[in-house]
From Swiss-Prot:
Record flagged with keyword Membrane: no
Gene expressing this chain: metK
Lineage: Bacteria, Pseudomonadati, Pseudomonadota, Gammaproteobacteria, Pasteurellales
Catalytic activity: L-methionine + ATP + H2O = S-adenosyl-L-methionine + phosphate + diphosphate
Organism: Glaesserella parasuis serovar 5 (strain SH0165)
Class of enzymatic activity (EC top level): transferase
Protein name according to UniProt: S-adenosylmethionine synthase
Length: 382
């Protein structure tokens, strides 16, 4: 009997890095609405009193970067200077240039199916049957706590809540099966006038208890709610934020490997993003088909080359067939060339801003979460 602990964290939509991600993806969405062929690599930096939007964008679209940036910050909830960041008064700086023609000539082709990868790199996808969304439980419930924090904050039920927050969950596993939750950490920015007792009780009753299944909690579960005792200064006033700095929060909470490439602000020609989505799609369909309890996919690409340079499948001893057979199945049933996976998942759409908070995976309405290949995979092995 092997017992171990595993921990994952999430952050709220008001965390500085997530503000940056949401601005970058909002810019991407607005451009894709007007110009599906745009090439976008948009980066954002936020700090007290300012947001800097930069990167390389080649497009026929026009986007009011300043107003869009202010709208995103406002939607998150930073609408008054007493929060340390105000959508209405912060400076918005624009430092956007064009994509290098050296990159462009390797990506664009007369035949779309020959479209090359926008860069070299490695990408991972993962799925596990330990939750109904085929995601690891620690990251899934850490995200749900953060979604609940935002819901309660925006409803006004706890009017002292502010946008910046973080969660962290430590799960107990016995022989790779969940036995319970060992530790809950939740820190949330709050108004200056509220005391620690009020914060603790409010967070427990309105955020934690409605989300975490009671069967996973016990008298031994430890709760650390705002453990420093005070969290008034938050958001970009507390820390600067950058696009692409929460890549583990965005994916599997450390339960699977990561290729290192961030997602937000990148159009689907960037395989850092689109191939990571495709790898999740492949892994999820293998698990949904009942062919493995856990599955990790690695893909790799070379800049300007359409076919993946490698495909790896790992099922951690839970697969119904060998990993070599899985690789053959993947090649037969999934088109993992850049244009192929874009078509397969219908990625040239303005769907990205929503991905930029609460995780890119495990939310069923995104196209890479479909399990429409599961039956075909099962049939191929009969």
């Amino acid at each position: 009997m092997a017992i171990n602990l595993f921990t994952s964290e999430s952050v709220s939509e008001g965390h500085p890095d997530k503000i940056a991600d949401q601005i970058s993806d909002a810019v991407l969405d607005e451009i894709l609405k007007q110009d599906p062929k745009a090439r976008v690599a948009c980066e954002t930096y936020v700090k007290t009193g300012m947001a800097l939007v930069g990167g390389e964008i080649t497009t026929s679209a026009w986007v009011d970067i300043e107003n869009l940036t202010r709208q995103v910050i406002c939607d998150i909830g930073y609408t008054h200077s007493d929060m340390g960041f105000d959508a209405h008064s912060c400076a918005v700086l624009n430092a956007i240039g064009k994509q290098s023609p050296d990159i462009n000539q390797g990506v664009d082709r007369a035949n779309p199916l020959e479209q090359g990868a926008g860069d070299q790199g490695i990408m991972f996808g993962y799925a596990t049957n330990e939750t109904e969304v085929l995601m690891p439980a620690p990251i899934t419930y850490a995200h749900r706590l953060m979604e609940q924090q935002a819901k309660v904050r925006k409803s006004g039920k706890l009017d002292w809540l502010r946008p910046d927050a973080k969660s962290q969950l430590t799960f107990i596993y016995e022989d790779n099966k969940i036995k319970g939750i060992d530790t809950v950490v939740l820190s949330t920015q709050h108004a200056e006038h509220v005391d620690q007792k009020t914060v603790f009780e409010g967070v427990m009753e309105e955020i934690i208890k409605p989300i975490l299944p009671s069967e996973w909690l016990s008298q031994n579960t430890k709760y650390f709610i705002n453990p420093t005792g005070r969290f008034v200064i938050g958001g970009p006033m507390g820390d600067c934020g950058l696009t692409g700095r929460k890549i583990i929060v965005d994916t599997y909470g450390g339960a699977a490997r990561h290729g290192g490439g961030a997602f937000s602000g990148k159009d689907p020609s960037k395989v850092d993003r689109s191939a990571a989505y495709a790898a999740r799609y492949v892994a999820k369909n293998i698990v949904a088909a009942g062919l493995a309890d856990r599955c990790e996919i690695q893909l790799s690409y070379a800049i300007g080359i359409a076919e993946p340079t490698s495909i790896m499948v790992e099922t951690f001893g839970t697969g119904k067939v060998s990993n070599e057979v899985f690789v053959r199945l993947v090649r037969e049933h999934f088109d993992l060339r850049p244009y192929g996976l874009i078509k397969m998942l219908d990625l040239i759409r303005p769907i990205y801003r929503e991905t930029a908070a609460y995780g890119h995976f495990g939310r069923e309405h995104f196209p890479w979460e479909k399990t429409d290949k599961a039956e075909a995979l099962k049939s191929a092995l009969r």
